[in-house]
Regions:
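Juxtamembrane transmembrane-helix boundary motif
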Residues: 1-20, 27-48, 53, 62-152, ...
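Hydrophobic alpha-helical transmembrane segments that constitute the membrane-spanning cores
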Residues: 24, 188-193
Length: 260
């Protein structure tokens, strides 16, 4: 039964990513926490397992997105390069930070983040382009913060990278495309870090590679890669404002549940 949950979750995450332009991690992590709890996984490790698994799935789902954006020349590779230098370091530190946070506290942190993202989507809050692109040190520092936070929340960083780039006067289309590209190094560095940090944890269930649960990774990755395209197509046929409000409502429910 749990394998069907992973396949459906991957499909939903893919559709949501295509519809709203956000990484599937914001919905994958909560559902995995509920699924792992239902399966009787140890409470002390299941949240970290959900975060690590979510990040590992983004490694695969980000590839299709980056290729699509690259074909139309929307990725600012010069920005990507310097952001990535900070991301690689920040993601490793973020995973290490998460390993020192208890499962209950980590759930509350993710719950607060889900509510913040929901509020941003519901009110359509966007930073105004008010500053120019920073120099190399500034991009590296920004990448470090984005990588650190993304590793803790189990996301690909789109909720952080896009606002930063648009604030720095990067056009929205290029900001989304460059953010998608940044999701790959975030996911790779974070997933590897979670694997290493959980490698010898005796509380992990069978078929785990550190804090990455392989059955969930496989099921989610397979379907999300296909359904992301469907979501992107659907986005052009439905009301974006109504869809964002519906997704925001879902995130409010998830966030409040994690905080209770």
């Amino acid at each position: 039964m749990e394998y069907l949950v992973y396949l459906v979750l991957g499909a939903c995450a893919g559709v949501l990513a295509g519809l709203f332009g956000v990484g599937g991690g914001i919905i994958i992590v909560p559902v995995l926490v509920f699924s792992f709890t239902a399966q009787g996984f140890e409470h002390e490790v299941l949240t970290h397992l959900a975060v690590g698994t979510s990040l590992a799935t983004i490694v695969f789902t980000s590839i299709n997105s980056v290729r699509a954006h690259h074909r139309v020349g929307a990725v600012r590779w010069s920005l990507f390069t310097w952001l990535t230098l900070g991301i690689l370091v920040g993601a490793g530190i973020g995973a290490l930070t998460a390993s020192y946070i208890t499962g209950d506290k980590l759930q509350k942190i993710i719950g607060v983040f889900a509510i913040l993202v929901a509020t941003q989507m519901a009110l359509d809050l966007r930073p105004k382009a008010s500053r120019s692109i920073p120099g190399k040190p500034g991009l590296i520092a920004a990448g470090g913060v984005i990588g650190w936070a993304s590793a803790i929340f189990g996301i690909g960083g789109g909720s952080l990278t896009v606002p930063f780039l648009t604030w720095r006067s990067v056009p929205m289309q290029q900001a989304v495309a460059t953010s998608s590209a940044c999701g790959f190094p975030i996911a790779v560095a974070s997933a590897i870090s979670f694997m290493v940090l959980g490698w010898h944890d005796p509380l992990l269930p069978p078929h785990s590679l550190g804090f990455v649960y392989l059955p969930a990774l496989l099921g989610i990755a397979v379907t999300s890669m296909f359904f992301a395209r469907f979501g992107a197509t659907l986005a052009h046929k439905l009301s974006p404002r109504m869809l964002k409000r519906l997704f925001a409502a879902l995130l409010y429910i998830v966030g409040i549940n994690f905080l209770l």
